[in-house]
Amino acid sequence: MTRLTLALDAMGGDFGPCVTVPASLQALASNLQLHLLLVGNPDTLSPLLAKADPVLLERLQVVPAESVIAGDAKPSQAIRASRGSSMRIALELTKNGDAQGCVSAGNTGALMGLAKMLIKPLDGIERPALMTVIPNQLGGKTVVLDLGANVECDSTMLVQFAVMGAVMAEEVVGIAQPRVALLNIGEEETKGLDNIREAAAVLKNTPAINYIGYLEGNDLLTGKTDVLVCDGFVGNVTLKTMEGVVRVFLSLLKSSGDGGKQAWWLKLLGRWLQKRVVKRFGHLNPDQYNGACLLGLRSTVIKSHGAANPHAFAVAIEQAVQAVQRQVPDRIAARLEAVLPKSD
């Protein structure tokens, strides 16, 4: 059995250790080869671990950290004051080889900046991108990036994202010759900002990329493409809007039929139908695919939603496990070398 070690920023996110500790124990229970370095304040973490299964604790080590980077801190200020923080120490453990990957629900900008500074981007990559894999209505999966790491992107960055996304779809998701599209306000070639049109022109002439053109936001879940590329501002708004709609939809399904005066048999029928529909669409629940990979780095770094619950954070940990096991950074580096020019 091969040991796999991850470093977790236990203090990051909206709920900190109240989420990360139970999620860690859940992840350890479901994966016997997993070892975790829980980075945070020992005085805060110890009480939450006191009643944990001693067998699980044999594969968990608390690494002390003096501080935590606030979720609303400006990235530049957070990075300057990051020494001794749980996020930075978790990344340093990954950089030094004590861990094979890092998971944090903390400040996205700070995580991006620190990861770029400590872990370093792959050759040929200007800036890493946040990527996730979401389910689509055809029963397949769609790789989407960037989801917020880079608010503004030039055409070169969009092309790099397209290459990384295609590699991810082919090497990890298992899609042969994945289709790649750019997210735009229309499918016509004349639509969109200059950077999008310039990226489209490059991708059309890149034989290694199966570029299919522009898609609009309403195609996010249709399965028309295997990789959808956009800048971080658009990607973040698009994904969170979709997640919000899905959460409301599932919530309405679960609550429908609970009130009002109905015959008993109608209530039973309603609940039966309700369970079937919730089960049918449950895979769209954002908690089931929490965890965005900071793609383009030399090691695995996963960003969890700040508001993740324990189950969702455990999913992010599993995302990191899969990325490490499938050697995502190495596979991307090998493919990038053949497609993109190396940076000076």
Swiss-Prot record:
Principal subcellular localisation of the protein: cytoplasm
Keywords on record: Cytoplasm, Lipid biosynthesis, Lipid metabolism, Phospholipid biosynthesis, Phospholipid metabolism, Transferase
Annotated GO MF terms: phosphate:acyl-[acyl carrier protein] acyltransferase activity
Highest taxon of the lineage: Bacteria
Localization, UniProt: Cytoplasm
Pathway(s) where this gene product acts: Lipid metabolism; phospholipid metabolism
GO annotations of cellular component type: cytoplasm
A Pfam match: FA_synthesis
Catalysed transformations (reactions): a fatty acyl-[ACP] + phosphate = an acyl phosphate + holo-[ACP]
One Gene Ontology term from the biological process aspect of the record: phospholipid biosynthetic process
First-tier enzyme category under EC: transferase
Keyword rRNA processing assigned: no
EC number: 2.3.1.274
Record text on subunit structure and interactions: Homodimer. Probably interacts with PlsY.
NCBIfam families membership: plsX
Family: Belongs to the PlsX family.
Function comment: Catalyzes the reversible formation of acyl-phosphate (acyl-PO(4)) from acyl-[acyl-carrier-protein] (acyl-ACP). This enzyme utilizes acyl-ACP as fatty acyl donor, but not acyl-CoA.
Name listed for the protein in its UniProt record: Phosphate acyltransferase
Species in which this protein is naturally found: Serratia proteamaculans (strain 568)
